[in-house]
């Protein structure tokens, strides 16, 4: 691709024809799918059906993302991300724009799927996501900008997939792209070093986001604020220990968090505590039952002793 490119990704209107400079393939845009720091992703029509086209801001970031997608394709049983289809440059009157074409993943946004299907899917999809992250981490990468906006639920059967790898970073380097709500640095709970625990923090925040779809800004000490939000959510009650451990960076790898998630899913949600009035009423009933049982026991004992004395006196 051309190394001398504009710094800004081009905004493309529906119906625009994107023609590759080198491979000469044509793509007609349908609508915007998403946007990020490195460029915009569009749904487009091609000679082979619908595809997703990402138009980048500069060549280096696009090359990096293409390398990640190629790496994904070498993972056995790959379901980590979309398949890479084409890489090219698009020449327009205002410059040359790098782009790549990938498989269009049909699905439903993660949060709307959970809202429609029910909160029990929070755990199921999180376990799936952690399994995929484990494979990504073992290949030497972290996702980086992990958030619901980059996740879809495809199927049936329902399967969580990610479609924008713009923030994917080699382990050991600095995270190159992030969103504040899902960034542990923003909450004062860790660095922006690319390591598995960075992604696992984001997984915990995705679970919080499922309970608080509108998200919220940091207004106090980060750990305290997140803990308060967690304990106010009934939907996340059974996952509190797992989420807390992920927020505090206690998981070194995805399998450890996944194992605890599976355990948490097997335990029924805790019942709400009874009010003091309810407890008092229950205590009175228990006291009354105990008194009645004692009276019955004493009467039975009296009959037994009386019968024994009767037999003893008969001889």
Each predicted region: which residue ranges?
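Catalytic-loop of the protein kinase fold
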Residues: 136-154
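C-terminal single-pass membrane-anchor helix
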Residues: 269-315
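ATP-binding glycine-rich loop module of kinase domains
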Residues: 5-8, 26, 30-31, 35-67
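Short beta-strand micro-motifs within the conserved protein kinase catalytic domain, predominantly
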Residues: 82-98
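C-lobe/activation-segment region of protein kinase-like
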Residues: 161, 166-240
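Activation segment signature within eukaryotic-like protein kinase domains
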Residues: 125-126
